[in-house]
């Protein structure tokens, strides 16, 4: 048996981070250390405890001493920096808390550089594109138009990685996530929120007219594409949109959720959000498709998969 790859996942008790961890520990040649401060993460999302090639450490990446202790003790080969303060309402209500994540970016990337990490993977966001100036949104040609603090922080993270590559030769891959959804997502996000409301026959609330268009990427497509980039050494020092190219309006999404849940929910319109609710988000996913090498899971199928496990949306009474 060769030397195990030592992998750090920050934010690994969150939705995407925990699914990534689960996938990476399927390979016994990987040893995964998951860190999370549990401010929004949940230990119930952590992998199977009977597997011996992972461990969890409660740690705040924005606290240098906390994360330095973990990284100095483990000398990681690869780092997935997925920790972030997330959720539309939360990030808009707490802009300074969002900006605090720049400390985590600085800590993780400087420690990675100093400890000769082979490659850093960064969870960026479609938010860096801002209100679209051209569609589909392409990694190379679409200008970035970040305005809200969350988008600015992601843009800062991307700029750090490009600068560190140029100056210190530290390799990276940036994933720009577009509305990933799945069973472990919290109800701070539109898909899980709509499903929670529909399953409880509560009114489904939509900000604005509902004509805003989005694409939704099922978690399995996200994880398969991103882990293939890791395993096969693809898109090094590059940016990859992770999303879907199937657009739907928020109003039509609400109607689809009502149909698939056989709900009695009515749709209720609220005033538009003050900022950050872009009218369209539509990624060019040519690179992602080259990583996935199969058809994406369609929206209806993905929602049905999510409905098969709603334990994080509707907690089971113990």
Residue map of PLM features:
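C-terminal "lid/loop" region of Rossmann-like NAD(P)-dependent oxidoreductases
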Residues: 209, 237-240, 248-254, 262-280
């Amino acid at each position: 048996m060769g030397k195990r790859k030592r992998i750090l996942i920050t934010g690994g008790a969150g939705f995407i981070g925990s699914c990534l961890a689960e996938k990476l520990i399927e390979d016994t040649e990987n040893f995964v250390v998951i860190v999370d401060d549990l401010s929004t993460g949940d230990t119930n999302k952590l992998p199977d405890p009977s597997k011996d090639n992972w461990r969890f450490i409660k740690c705040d990446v924005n606290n240098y001493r906390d994360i330095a202790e973990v990284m100095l003790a483990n000398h990681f080969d690869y780092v997935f920096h997925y920790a972030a303060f997330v959720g539309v309402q939360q990030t808009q209500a707490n802009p300074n808390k969002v900006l605090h994540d720049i400390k985590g970016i600085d800590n993780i990337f400087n420690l990675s550089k100093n400890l000769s990490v082979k490659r850093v993977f960064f969870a960026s966001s479609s938010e860096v594109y801002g209100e679209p100036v051209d569609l589909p949104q392409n990694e190379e040609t679409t200008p970035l138009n970040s305005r809200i603090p969350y988008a600015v922080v992601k843009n800062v993270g991307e700029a750090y990685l490009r600068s560190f590559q140029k100056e210190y030769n530290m390799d990276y891959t940036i994933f720009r996530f577009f509305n990933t959804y799945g069973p472990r997502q919290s109800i701070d996000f539109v898909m899980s929120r709509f499903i929670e409301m529909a399953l409880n026959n509560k009114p489904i609330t939509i900000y604005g007219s509902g004509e805003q268009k989005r694409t939704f990427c099922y978690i399995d497509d996200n994880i398969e594409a991103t882990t293939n980039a890791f395993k096969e050494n693809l898109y090094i020092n590059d940016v990859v949109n992770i999303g879907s190219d199937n657009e739907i309006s928020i109003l039509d999404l609400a109607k689809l959720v009502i149909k698939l849940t056989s709900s009695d929910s009515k749709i209720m319109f609220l005033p538009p959000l003050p900022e950050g609710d872009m009218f369209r988000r539509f990624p060019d996913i040519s690179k992602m498709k080259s990583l996935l090498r199969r058809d994406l899971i369609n929206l209806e199928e993905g929602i049905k998969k999510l409905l098969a496990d709603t334990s994080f949306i509707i907690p089971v009474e113990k």
